[in-house]
Structure formats: C-alpha cells, structure tokens
Amino acid sequence: MASGILLNVKEEVTCPICLELLTEPLSLHCGHSFCQACITANHKKSMLYKEGERSCPVCRISYQPENIQPNRHVANIVEKLREVKLSPEEGQKVDHCARHGEKLLLFCQEDSKVICWLCERSQEHRGHHTFLMEEVAQEYHVKLQTALEMLRQKQQEAEKLEADIREEKASWKIQIDYDKTNVSADFEQLREILDWEESNELQNLEKEEEDILKSLTKSETEMVQQTQYMRELISELEHRLQGSMMDLLQGVDGIIKRIENMTLKKPKTFHKNQRRVFRAPDLKGMLDMFRELTDARRYWVDVTLAPNNISHAVIAEDKRQVSSRNPQIMYQAPGTLFTFPSLTNFNYCTGVLGSQSITSGKHYWEVDVSKKSAWILGVCAGFQSDAMYNIEQNENYQPKYGYWVIGLQEGVKYSVFQDGSSHTPFAPFIVPLSVIICPDRVGVFVDYEACTVSFFNITNHGFLIYKFSQCSFSKPVFPYLNPRKCTVPMTLCSPSS
C-alpha cells in the first residue's frame, strides 16, 4: 500500500513535459507545475510559432510570465522522493522503473537500457527502437558469451605479454649485471696491468740505479787511488827539491820519465740524454684491446675435436683434449676413443680439426696450452693429402695452403707462419713473435666476413699476440690444434670455464 501511495505522489510531482521528477519546479496560476528548464523552452517555442501567445502545455489556459512562481513546497516533496528512491529497499526492486514504478519490460537498443512503457513514451527515448526483453535476451546472451570468450582469450594474451615482459626484464637485469661484472673485471685487469707496468718500471729503474752507482763507485775508488798516487808523487818531488844534491840526482831520469808517460785515467760516465725514456702505457690502446677481446668473447662457441685417419693424435673421450703419442706405440690409451697407428712411409703428423665448420659470422674459442713446450693452433681450411707429407717440417703451414696459425717450439720460441717467397714457395716465412709472458691459454677469434684471425694471450690480460688480415676464406675453415711431439695435451676450454 505504501508503494502505491508513493507512486501516486510521484505522478503528482512529475513534469508533464519531460516526464521526470520536477527540477526547480515553477507553478502557473492554473495550478500545473513544470521544470524551470521545460517551461522556459515551451515559452520560447510559443513565442516563435504562436505570435507571442503563452498557454499551459496541459490545460492550454493562457498565462503571463509574471504569474509564474517557484513552488518550494513541491521542490521539498521532490527532494524527499529522491531520497526514498535511493534507499536500499527501493534499490532492490530491480524489476520496476526507478522513475515511474512501472515494470521493466522493454529494451531500448539505442541507449542499451531496460525501460518501462512510460520511459518509451518519454522525450528521452522518443523515436528509439524498443523490443520486449524476451525477444532480444537470447541474442544478446550469445553476443555476451562470444565477447566473454574473446575477453578470456585476450586475458590469456595479456598474461603471456605480462610474463614475457617480466622474463625480458629479468633477462635484461641478468645481462646488465653480467656486463657490470665484466666491466669491473676489465678495469681490474687494467689496474693489474698498470700495477705490473709500474712494478716492472720501478724494478728497471732500481736495476739501472744499481748498475750505474756500482760503476760510478768503482770509478770513484779508482779516482781516489789516482789522486792519492799523485799526492805521493808530488810529495816525493818536493822532498828531492828540498834535499841534498845527492837526493836530487839519485834516479832522477826514471822519475821524470815516469811523470812524462803518466796518463790520467778518466772515470766512466753515463749520459742522461742517452737513457731509456719512460713512457706511460697506451691506456687507449689497452681499452681498445680489452673491448676487442670482450667483443670476441661474446661469440664463444663450444668447439669439439673431430677424428681423422691421417693424424697420429690421441683424442680424449670428451673430444676436447688432444695429445701426441709415440707412433710406435700401438695400444688403446685409457680414457680415449680414437688412436691412429703409424702409417708406412708417412710423416708423423699430430694435427686435428674441430668438428664445427666456419662458413660465416664470428667465432671464438680458447685453448689451454699450459706446460707445453711445442704446439701449433689457429684455423685450417681442411686437410689436403698432398700437403701433409711435409707438414711436420713446417713446409705447408702457410695461408696460401689454408693455414692461419701461430706456434711454439723449444718452449720459448713463438712464431707466426706466413707465405713463403716465390723462390721458395714450399718454405713458409716464419716470423718470431715477441711474447713477454708465456700464455697458458690462447684465445682464437675468427671474423669470417672481415677475413681476420686474431690470437689473444689470455694469461697476459688478453694482449693481442697476432692478427691475420685479408685472409682468403674461399671455403669453410675449421679450428686447428696440433700438439706436435710434446706429449702434454692441448685442451679446448668450455665457454663456462
């Protein structure tokens, strides 16, 4: 019953023009009330089409603007009704129109709202396409179900994107932390090099000081002895001159001859302008070298060795280590997969290739040569039978035969093998290399497109040992290791070592 009374009250305070609860209600002298905006718009419309005649939109009774009065009583009722409409009890009545109290049976397609029949007739929905809810519910249920599936798919994509960005974030964090570690390590190496250079230079200066001062001290002693001899001789002559005639003449010719033949011994001196001038290390060159090695190590590949039927090498089971053996020994070495017997009338060869061929790109690997007195390493364009007969005599280790290698012999002689002259095409030009610190580990970097092969002394802070330029890579090349006749093995280092 209370709801019915409430609906009746709402009808009394509903604007006849907009069918909404009155807003700033104004009343005419005929008793009808309207929203201020609605009656003002109606007044303007009447002035435009009816030659200034103003009439009530409900009863058509004429009125004058001065007769319009604000209706505060109705405004208070509307305010109370709005509070009642927003109460929890009213809000729970979802099947009735909040404005008109009628059942919500229609769906407005343009506004996508559920409305009552009074809403359909209002100015807000006038001319819109409306349908019974039962007519469109199934259609929109299918559309919503499709939208839900689409949304779930997009949610999965969003979750994957979220996971991907988190993974990328973590990857970048790891990479930058790794780069920070490398930068710190590189500069620590630079500091070690500078400390070593300083210590070495100070030792050289101390040695120079010791040698010079020792020589000058010896010269000083000789000069003191010479001066003392002069004093004694002068004293003897003064004594003769002051003594008797006998003293004067006794042995006088010998003394005069001794004085005339006397030559002053001059001390050994050292010219300061001929000294070795100290020059600070080329820090820019060092940084460039470190950057080159750091860049090369980004292309570290996991190289393993490939057996062949022409090498007298022993390859370990993990295919990372190779050593030479006496060609007369014919048994299987423990822990090895491959051994090769001596071949009649065939020179003793211990070279082996890596399994991985290089046809493009950049490739880097490191070889442990510690405690070896002889070795050869680098890259090779593949074994050629006609080039193997004199290989152990170094006659074919030339770039023109597909070998870009450096080597060690007799424990201290480092060399690079270059092409021989036209007069001796089978004899390589062996160039000695200046290596201050003997490498226990050598890095090899191949840039196929740039046609270069570089060798780094990892033991000595990665200093460049030698670099081949303008290499003629006309076919695939392979890592090449040759332990020679030194039985100590050569070992390919893993990228994680």
Curated annotation (Swiss-Prot):
Phenotype upon changing L237K: No effect on dimerization or higher order self-association
UniProt-reported outcome of changing S219K: No effect on dimerization or higher order self-association
GO process annotations (BP): activation of innate immune response; autophagy; defense response to virus; host-mediated suppression of symbiont invasion; innate immune response; negative regulation of viral genome replication; negative regulation of viral transcription; positive regulation of canonical NF-kappaB signal transduction
Domain-level remarks: The B box-type zinc finger domain and the coiled-coil domain contribute to the higher and low order multimerization respectively which is essential for restriction activity. The coiled coil domain is important for higher order multimerization by promoting the initial dimerization. The B30.2/SPRY domain acts as a capsid recognition domain. Polymorphisms in this domain explain the observed species-specific differences among orthologs.
Phosphoserine PTM positions: S87
Protein name per the record: Tripartite motif-containing protein 5
Effect of L202K: No effect on dimerization or higher order self-association
Catalytic activity: S-ubiquitinyl-[E2 ubiquitin-conjugating enzyme]-L-cysteine + [acceptor protein]-L-lysine = [E2 ubiquitin-conjugating enzyme]-L-cysteine + N(6)-ubiquitinyl-[acceptor protein]-L-lysine
Subunit structure: Can form homodimers and homotrimers. In addition to lower-order dimerization, also exhibits a higher-order multimerization and both low- and high-order multimerizations are essential for its restriction activity. Interacts with MAP3K7/TAK1, TAB2 and TAB3. Interacts with HSPA8/HSC70, PSMC2, PSMC4, PSMC5 and PSMD7. Interacts with SQSTM1. Interacts (via B30.2/SPRY domain) with HSPA1A/B. Interacts with TRIM6 and TRIM34. Interacts with BECN1; GABARAP. Interacts with ULK1 (phosphorylated form), GABARAPL1, GABARAPL2, MAP1LC3A and MAP1LC3C.
Alphabetized GO MF terms: identical protein binding; pattern recognition receptor activity; protein homodimerization activity; protein kinase binding; ubiquitin protein ligase activity; ubiquitin-protein transferase activity; zinc ion binding
Residues where N-acetylalanine is found: A2
Matching Gene3D superfamilies: 2.60.120.920, Classic Zinc Finger (3.30.160.60), Zinc/RING finger domain, C3HC4 (zinc finger) (3.30.40.10)
